[in-house]
Amino acid sequence: MISKLTVMTITMYGADWCSDCVRAEKFFVDNNIEFQKIDLELDENEHFVESEVLRRNNGKKSIPVIVFDDDSHLTEPTNAQLAEKLGLLS
């Protein structure tokens, strides 16, 4: 698990109907990792959110897009990719 000393800001752009989004959200919850979820379908700034997803994916509307505090991002990551990015693998 990530310690309180290494807390990073994580923002996940996704939707409730997206199975990869649901899986990524479960990964964060199961590992006690705080994150902000922005739902493409429900956010009042829907146009900004959609343009952010498209910008990070070279024009593709693939989700989830998970953005980290260093401005890097992962699109449709596996749990193993998330664990590696977050330093959970030993």
Question: Over which residues does each language-model region extend?
Answer:
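Short, structured active-site "lid" loops
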Residues: 52-75
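Local sequence-structure signature of Cys/Sec-based thiol-disulfide redox active-site neighborhoods
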Residues: 2-34
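Thioredoxin-like thiol-disulfide oxidoreductase module
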Residues: 40-60, 88-89
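Glycine-/small-residue-rich active-site loops that bind phosphorylated ligands and cofactors
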Residues: 19, 41, 45, 73-74
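Non-catalytic, surface beta->alpha helical segment in thiol-disulfide oxidoreductase systems
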Residues: 68-90
